[in-house]
């Protein structure tokens, strides 16, 4: 019998705020089952570095050997007499912190909701720990010795009945995987063969229950049902890997608070591009603005730390917080600000994934689920970042290291405005991550640091932000300004509006000769791409929905086709490209994607702004050209 070992470890007094397990969603796909009734209790504790030094100085000073051995010794000392196994997913993070994970066992079986994680600092010493180990009375004998449990098929039927699952098991058979795990073969109605695992689970009343963990993937719900191993009509707890969440936001493509109202959107993710949803990384489900693609939080002091920064948390996954443009100070609406930033960045992730910015291309995800590339690199999203004002930025390291977006408070209006609420700002910044990862390959993040190539980086950001926010009634005579809301100015923060009218926007390729600043050069590049956009829309029409529709791998409208070609061009062009090379890469992208069916539309767009056939690059004396190939004249 294991007694009150937590007291000896100094952990009983700690607040129980670390989640040990994914949390279930609030409904079961319309089947009338309230999963809140089966929700697992939050029963983990966390000991910070300061707590370790104060309460466990001997353990905090442990070092030497490798980090796995050190972490194992920590668990042995803090949980004497308990049995456990190391989970095979330990790693050293980019910050130098080593993370090692353990699962408590009893009589050779997992206690499925009893975990221990040890964090080792880069100095080799214990940084912090968290755990949800069970410390109550233990059964005297292993259940396999007494055969003190039901047939797994009974547990499977019990789960299906209790949760009203539409699974036909009339012809089901059991396939034994190992001593404690089985698979239910011959069923229909689930996405894959259901599975069963004999395991313990720590109950809320401090006792231990022997259960069959029945796993059923129903598509809209992916369930782990903990069915009592003796009374199979009793389900103790249910975990749903599919999270149902609501966000109160300015829904895409609303660009800023002046052009629409906030609304509540439910489950806005695309499971084809974010298979774990936005609030899970495939291992842990979160109840805050954190997931596989991004982690969003306040960063009032502008520091580098983000994991311990404030972010809204909602156990029922309702990220609905008050906001109005006249609210002040900005901290009063930080929950809404973080939520909006998280929503917009994830929308960008999902769209860019559909357009080709996948794992192998170097996108930003913690878990690449076997699709290539390097993981552990979600985007760190800092709302109301205190390191500056009237700006925003994006840091793009090579694939495998997290990107970082910092959006600031803008003081050009009264009251000040948080740039999380201007979608164009978020899209622009995220697009820096896109272009830097694609140009020159995911491992080379330094290909856009020249004046012209860096200018194109700014131009791509404006272009994607502008194209995404087009309205249903827009046409080639529509003009767009970048940053007008945060700047509190109808002129925004660019030289001219984006327009196909040369009187409204006279910029051409040779305009770059008089500019020596990347945003100005970027405005020229985006002005050229804006012509490309409308030439393709005029030919193929415009899809006003939030995602493209593909036919044989090609977007069937001009807007998303333009985005696709520009994105593909980024990956095709050389490191440190010029306008001329980027132009050629886009034309090559169309040749690859559509066999060149848009060649003339592209050339005419480029030529209109002086980037025609005869255009030549010289950093101080660019040569413009309005010529197009003979077949396009």
From Swiss-Prot:
Zn(2+) binds at residues 428, 432. GO terms for biological process: proteolysis. Binds 1 zinc ion per subunit. The active site is at residue 429. Its EC number is 3.4.24.-. Its cofactor is Zn(2+). The keyword Secreted applies. The keyword Isomerase does not apply. One of its GO terms (molecular function) is zinc ion binding. InterPro entries: FTP_domain, Fungal_virulence_M36, Peptidase_M36, Peptidase_M4/M1_CTD_sf. One of its GO terms (cellular component) is extracellular region. Glycans are attached at residues 285, 592, 621. Keywords: Glycoprotein, Hydrolase, Metal-binding, Metalloprotease, Protease, Secreted, Signal, Virulence, Zinc, Zymogen. Gene3D superfamilies: 3.10.170.10, Neutral Protease Domain 2 (1.10.390.10). It is found in: Secreted. Residues 21-244 form a propeptide. Residues 1-20 form the signal peptide. Secreted metalloproteinase probably acting as a virulence factor. Belongs to the peptidase M36 family. This is Probable extracellular metalloproteinase 5. It comes from Trichophyton verrucosum (strain HKI 0517).
